[in-house]
Amino acid sequence: MSYNCSSGNFSSCCFGSYLRYPVSTYNLFYPSNAIYSPNTCQLGSSLYNGCQETYCEPTSCQTSCTLARSYQTSCYCPKNSIFCSPRQTNYIRSLGCGNTGLGSLGCGSTGFQSLDCGSSFYHPTTFSSRNFQATCY
């Protein structure tokens, strides 16, 4: 996979079937749930350097997720997407609910439970293959 990013915030970043959006755009809809990724983002077996202040989502969920005011369980994604469970979409996050690798938006009614705190990212397929349906806390 490859990516094309500007320095600092992304204007747009594509890799594989995923889109990466800048936090400035994200904050227009979700100012209280901004998601940040570290300078090195692990996606599958590849490392992407220089990734900052972004969140990622599968392109297949782009319309339903980005236009919604909040992330609801009605935002469905393909079952075979590495960042999606059969019911909800997961997003990369680093700082929030402690130092966590992969987490999800909407902690509470729509969020998955955050993974154990730590500095390293979890492999996406490992995360999505497990059943995280408790709320964040």
UniProtKB/Swiss-Prot annotation:
Which keywords accompany this UniProt record?
A: Keratin
The record's annotation in InterPro entries points to: KRTAP_PMG
Per the record, the domain of life is Eukaryota
Q: Could you give one GO CC term from the UniProt record?
A: intermediate filament
One Pfam family name from the record? PMG
Regarding protein family, the annotation reads:
Belongs to the PMG family.
Q: Partners and quaternary state?
A: Interacts with hair keratins.
Please explain the role this protein plays, according to its UniProt record.
Answer: In the hair cortex, hair keratin intermediate filaments are embedded in an interfilamentous matrix, consisting of hair keratin-associated proteins (KRTAP), which are essential for the formation of a rigid and resistant hair shaft through their extensive disulfide bond cross-linking with abundant cysteine residues of hair keratins. The matrix proteins include the high-sulfur and high-glycine-tyrosine keratins.
Q: What is the name attached to this protein's record? A: Keratin-associated protein 15-1
